[in-house]
Amino acid sequence: MTHSTLHQPDTATGQGLQRQLIVILDFGSQYSELIARRIRETQVYSEVISYRTTAEQLAQLAPKGIILSGGPNSVYDENAPQCDPEIWNLGIPILGVCYGMQLMVQQLGGTVERAIAGEYGKAALFIDDPTDLLTNVEQETIMWMSHGDSVTELPPGFRVLAHTDNTPIAAIAHPERKLYGVQFHPEVVHSVGGIALIRNFVYHICDCEPTWTTAAFVEEAIREVRAKVGDKRVLLALSGGVDSSTLAFLLHRAIGDQLTCMFIDQGFMRKGEPERLLKLFQEQFHIKVEYVNARDRFLAQLVGVTDPEEKRKRIGHEFIRVFEEESQRLGPFDYLAQGTLYPDVIESANTNIDPQTGERVAVKIKSHHNVGGLPENLRFKLVEPLRKLFKDEVRQVGRSLGLPEEIVQRHPFPGPGLAIRILGEVTPERLEILRDADLIVRQEINRAQMYHELWQAFAVLLPIRTVGVMGDQRTYAYPVVLRFVTSEDGMTADWARVPYDLLERISNRIVNEVPGVNRVVYDITSKPPGTIEWE
């Protein structure tokens, strides 16, 4: 599968909206897609493309502005990634962020050196020149730093806009050429004045207009789906989550009965979910859903399997086998619709720049069910109208299409379902234990009116047994882990500081109502270093 996020601009989604386009040249930063998200929050379309994109290609795209991302390299590494130096002569406003600022300085004749002391985390930023880029930013504010190199000498024509105690040159500008740089990360939530700075660049310097709206996206996505699909039939694997449900509503509005949704019940969903899903789509919204009970097939694939990556692969491969068999029975179909999102692509094919070779290298985190299991000879053509959206944007689109709030606000749920929330081998007994524990978690979170405050809240079953005492009897049973996190987009997350009495109620109910469990623990790990899911 081609990941256009990190290569050339995606002209299939947002083509008309790209008249107000900000492009981000990605130098391997973990925050590149977050920059895009922040710009979209200002209602301007933004995409991440390769740092190797030439000035000529950029000129053809005609973006309103260019942002150079941060990155893990030093500009003086032998094979440090370099942008085309001709971009400085395009006359397009450019903002360099961290490594991007250092690269700007180096290529334009300034000096970058290893800092005496690196700067990481929150730092007080002092504004020296509150001109266009820093308009409406407090004279003293907090920004997020992450750099070991620093600019020590400016290129001709540049001036200093801001400093910190450890970094004398923390923001720079050449207003006549509309070239700007910041040593900090304005896109990170910890940067107090970051959003104001980004808005200044987008609106005051790049002169953009707010055209990236939910209504505009829906209108254009429907138009593009109709143009691509024509009178052909489309098959969609419906999971009941916000992504596939939003996609189903969008496609149904675009092509009506040309869409067939297939719900494959692998046996790894939460308690009562298959029944609720079918009732909602078939009876309430009259969208055709073909139900396939494949529980035994999937469970048979996992007998004796304990490795999480092997679980994902087997589930993904079996899903495709079932999907292809059923599609032949129901077909023919020309297109397969997928609800691939930005975070899916980011986590499945994260990239860094190898300082020794200068080449991109994949940093494998884990396979995502919806992007990692497709065979090379897939006979469907793909339709992925949501692939450039972040989760919060998908929710906005779903809401605008009339999707019920119970689905719009549904917590993210992995494609392999409870199979990757059971560590070790998946068995019918363990599935039943986890379903019952998970139901209690959801009931109590809703009763406490905290469901919408959390990004995810779920239970994990561990493959070990612990000693306990219940009544006068010694027990030897499973522990359950509670995993509650807060997040904006799933790219980073923090463990949720929920009330102790809520945790106590959940723990008491689980150990008393779920046979086979005698211990409940709470996970207080953030992402990074951990991931949200345990597998």
From Swiss-Prot:
<feature type="active site">
    <location>
        <position position="187"/>
    </location>
</feature>
<dbReference type="InterPro" id="IPR017926">
    <property type="entry name" value="GATASE"/>
</dbReference>
<keyword id="KW-0315">Glutamine amidotransferase</keyword>
<dbReference type="Pfam" id="PF00117">
    <property type="entry name" value="GATase"/>
</dbReference>
<dbReference type="InterPro" id="IPR014729">
    <property type="entry name" value="Rossmann-like_a/b/a_fold"/>
</dbReference>
<comment type="function">
    <text>Catalyzes the synthesis of GMP from XMP.</text>
</comment>
<feature type="domain" description="GMPS ATP-PPase">
    <location>
        <begin position="212"/>
        <end position="410"/>
    </location>
</feature>
<dbReference type="InterPro" id="IPR022955">
    <property type="entry name" value="GMP_synthase"/>
</dbReference>
<dbReference type="InterPro" id="IPR029062">
    <property type="entry name" value="Class_I_gatase-like"/>
</dbReference>
<feature type="domain" description="Glutamine amidotransferase type-1">
    <location>
        <begin position="21"/>
        <end position="211"/>
    </location>
</feature>
<dbReference type="Pfam" id="PF02540">
    <property type="entry name" value="NAD_synthase"/>
</dbReference>
<dbReference type="Pfam" id="PF00958">
    <property type="entry name" value="GMP_synt_C"/>
</dbReference>
<protein>
    <recommendedName>
        <fullName>GMP synthase [glutamine-hydrolyzing]</fullName>
        <ecNumber>6.3.5.2</ecNumber>
    </recommendedName>
</protein>
<dbReference type="GO" id="GO:0003921">
    <property type="term" value="F:GMP synthase activity"/>
</dbReference>
<keyword id="KW-0067">ATP-binding</keyword>
<keyword id="KW-0658">Purine biosynthesis</keyword>
<comment type="subunit">
    <text>Homodimer.</text>
</comment>
<comment type="pathway">
    <text>Purine metabolism; GMP biosynthesis; GMP from XMP (L-Gln route): step 1/1.</text>
</comment>
<keyword id="KW-0547">Nucleotide-binding</keyword>
<dbReference type="GO" id="GO:0005524">
    <property type="term" value="F:ATP binding"/>
</dbReference>
<dbReference type="InterPro" id="IPR001674">
    <property type="entry name" value="GMP_synth_C"/>
</dbReference>
<keyword id="KW-0332">GMP biosynthesis</keyword>
<dbReference type="InterPro" id="IPR022310">
    <property type="entry name" value="NAD/GMP_synthase"/>
</dbReference>
<feature type="binding site">
    <location>
        <begin position="239"/>
        <end position="245"/>
    </location>
    <ligand>
        <name>ATP</name>
    </ligand>
</feature>
<dbReference type="GO" id="GO:0005829">
    <property type="term" value="C:cytosol"/>
</dbReference>
<feature type="active site" description="Nucleophile">
    <location>
        <position position="98"/>
    </location>
</feature>
<keyword id="KW-0436">Ligase</keyword>
<dbReference type="InterPro" id="IPR025777">
    <property type="entry name" value="GMPS_ATP_PPase_dom"/>
</dbReference>
<dbReference type="InterPro" id="IPR004739">
    <property type="entry name" value="GMP_synth_GATase"/>
</dbReference>
<feature type="active site">
    <location>
        <position position="185"/>
    </location>
</feature>
